[in-house]
């Protein structure tokens, strides 16, 4: 006996129902394991013990050398970036700055300079930045870094006058937010990045020249290292880096159930 159209529809509906049930029982797998509540509380206590309040002006460093306490990393193909202490009397904290140069043409190239031995869950980061010609280039802060393939970054494109928050997981970049920014008519611009939390939501805020530019929610990555970053082909200058933990905004216990 040939199956009727009604029987065929019934069989297809049954198959679809079984597929939905099976898929519903499969939990999504994150590329990077997330912290549970106990791990977050332990990290908070560690953040509050001190030792994470740092300011770098680089003025006592020897020129033509990599800044002490920092290590270069590279994400993406191509030649590694070049980092060195240079003399610059125009710097906000003269005479020394950090200069970074990347010759990689691809936007997937990230050249990182990471502070060693320091990990933050909710960092408050500030610094002053400028590009070689004052108008072109992309650079900013990197944080929550686990390795060269897993991190957050806040980037400022001085030529396009744009700010971005990105997440890199296993080398794959996701833009979490971007917006146009108004830059002040000055040589050295300011960049501030805060990672904060309200109840169970983590969010990232970026301030350019003192103005809030972006606020995005994401909690894929947890505690990690911090540093500076360049994207693509550029030469950037960095000065007066501050890094402190924003632990005072972190709840000490789980929120009440209402």
Report residues per predicted region:
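Short, aromatic/His-centered strand-loop micro-motif at the edge of beta-sheets
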Residues: 169-190
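Extracellular glycan-recognition surfaces and repeat-rich motifs
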Residues: 62-98, 109
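Flexible glycan-contacting loops in extracellular carbohydrate-active proteins
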Residues: 215-239
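Extracellular beta-strand elements of beta-rich domains used
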Residues: 58, 239-243
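Secretory/extracellular carbohydrate-interaction modules
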Residues: 101-165
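Bacterial N-terminal signal peptides
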Residues: 13-25
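Carbohydrate-binding surfaces in secreted/extracellular proteins
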Residues: 58, 127, 189-215
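Extracellular carbohydrate-recognition regions
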Residues: 34-76, 249-258
């Amino acid at each position: 006996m040939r199956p009727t159209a009604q029987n065929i529809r019934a069989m297809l509906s049954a198959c679809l129902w079984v597929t939905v049930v099976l898929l519903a029982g499969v939990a999504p797998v994150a590329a990077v394991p997330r912290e549970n509540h106990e791990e977050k509380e332990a990290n908070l206590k560690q953040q509050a013990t001190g030792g994470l309040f740092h300011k770098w002006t680089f003025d006592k460093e020897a020129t033509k050398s990599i800044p002490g306490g920092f290590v270069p990393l590279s994400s993406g193909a191509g030649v590694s970036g070049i980092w060195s202490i240079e003399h610059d009397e125009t710097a906000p904290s003269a005479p020394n700055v950090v200069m970074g140069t990347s010759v990689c043409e691809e936007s997937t190239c990230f050249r990182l300079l990471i502070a060693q031995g320091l990990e933050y869950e909710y960092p408050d980061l500030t610094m002053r930045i400028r590009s070689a010609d004052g108008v072109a280039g992309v650079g900013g802060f990197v944080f929550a870094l686990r390795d060269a393939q897993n991190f957050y970054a806040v980037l400022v494109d001085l030529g396009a006058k744009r700010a971005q928050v990105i997440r890199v997981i296993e080398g794959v970049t996701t833009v979490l937010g971007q917006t146009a920014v108004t830059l002040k008519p000055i040589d050295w611009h300011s960049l501030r990045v805060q990672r904060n939390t309200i109840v169970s939501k983590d969010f990232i805020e970026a301030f350019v020249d003192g103005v809030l530019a972006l606020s995005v929610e994401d909690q894929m990555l947890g505690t990690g290292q911090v540093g500076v970053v360049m994207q693509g082909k550029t030469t950037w200058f960095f000065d007066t880096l501050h890094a402190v933990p924003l632990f005072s905004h972190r709840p000490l216990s789980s929120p009440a159930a209402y």
